[in-house]
Amino acid sequence: NLFKQKQEGYYAVYVRVPNGNISSDVSRQLIAQLEGVIADDVRVTINQGLQFRFIKPESLPYVYSVLDAAGLAAPGFGSVADITSCPGTDTCNLGISNSTGTALALSEVIEEEFPEFLFNKDITVRISGCMNSCGQHGMASVGFHGSSLKAKGQVVPALQVLVGGAVLGSGDARISDKVIKVPSKRAPAVLTTIFNDYKTSAAAEESFTDYSFRKGEKYYYELLKPLANLETLSDDEFMDWGQEVKFSTAIGVGECAGVMIDLVSTLILEAEEKILAAEDCFSNEQWADSIYNAYAAQ
């Protein structure tokens, strides 16, 4: 999680934040303890972590002790165990599946069953609660996005599995292939199957990116097909991760998607409120806030 900056005599530290969740109390505590030790600004990374910059070598042990006390000194930033996930049904109006619960379950699988992958930065796992790519599932080595299936007259929480995405460098990238849809509770089995296959079948020194590209979408479909069998569903698989009631889909607004309302009219109302806020900020010469609200209204 540490690297030497191009500015002579300084280091930067990446902080792995599980699910990107950090409380305001912990944030304030970190800033208070690290003031004068790190740069005045803290950067948020695309994979939901933090970056502290301009740290002198003699201050590194102190920075580590502060992070360790806050439970944020775990290694493996940017590795396969550092799973990126959108909030999903925890807070999002459009979420279909509980992506944060899935992320925690998959992190446990990696840490317990594949410790040799903990520092592997060639493989990425990313999860979105719906088909929109807020969790960046379309550019993941192994991606998941929320969906649903019907079985035995009931709705089953499901995940669309994608394989083979990668950032190749020099402006090149590869979009992952949609492979198969499985019940959400089988996501750990999907990851275990894919990783065990890679361990046993890849050529020496062959990266997962190269291996998955060589094997292709049809290969992974056949590999994962047994996990899509809905005839073997257990009662637990009708409930999403972190839930104790049977899964159902709904459209709503606010922090809870359980209240059924007209989403379109509500979004228009919210846009009108943003426009009024932008006009108010503009009249008070709060230029940045005015621009923000005007942009949000669109």
Regions found by a protein language model. Give the residues of each.
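Peripheral terminal and linker regions in Fe-S/redox and tRNA-modifying enzymes
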Residues: 1-279
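Amphipathic alpha-helix face/heptad-repeat signature
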Residues: 267, 293-294
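Inward-facing hydrophobic residues that define packing positions of alpha-helical scaffold repeats
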Residues: 275, 282, 287, 294-295
